Amino acid sequence: MEQEQDTPWTQSTEHINTQKGGSGQQTRKLERPNSTQLMDHYLRTMNQVDMHKQTASWKQWLSLKDPTQESLKIHVLKRWKLFNKQEWTN
């Protein structure tokens, strides 16, 4: 029977229970998360990423000094191209 490979996703979502054994040594028991836990973890992670992107975007926007309509247009187009390039690579 093939053993499931651990991926960064499963490693980050595994729940580790530490228990003391009879000899006083600690044992670790790994539990695989169920689909509800995975979805909850995914949604929380994506929400944090979206908030970070929005904050970074606003900070950049506010850092522009005396923006003209043309400079804003160039800035927005550059950000759009970069965003689309990242979307295609992911």
From Swiss-Prot:
Region (Disordered): 1-34
Biased composition (Polar residues): 1-20
Places the protein is found: Host mitochondrion inner membrane; Host nucleus; Host cytoplasm, Host cytosol
A GO CC annotation given for this chain: host cell mitochondrial inner membrane
Record bears the keyword Nucleotide-binding: no
Keywords associated with the record: Apoptosis, Host cytoplasm, Host membrane, Host mitochondrion, Host mitochondrion inner membrane, Host nucleus, Host-virus interaction, Inhibition of host innate immune response by virus, Inhibition of host MAVS by virus, Inhibition of host RLR pathway by virus, Membrane, Modulation of host cell apoptosis by virus, Viral immunoevasion
Superkingdom assignment: Viruses
HAMAP family reported in the protein's UniProt record: INFV_PB1F2
Role: Plays an important role in promoting lung pathology in both primary viral infection and secondary bacterial infection. Promotes alteration of mitochondrial morphology, dissipation of mitochondrial membrane potential, and cell death. Alternatively, inhibits the production of interferon in the infected cell at the level of host mitochondrial antiviral signaling MAVS. Its level of expression differs greatly depending on which cell type is infected, in a manner that is independent of the levels of expression of other viral proteins. Monocytic cells are more affected than epithelial cells.
Protein name according to UniProt: Protein PB1-F2
Gene: PB1
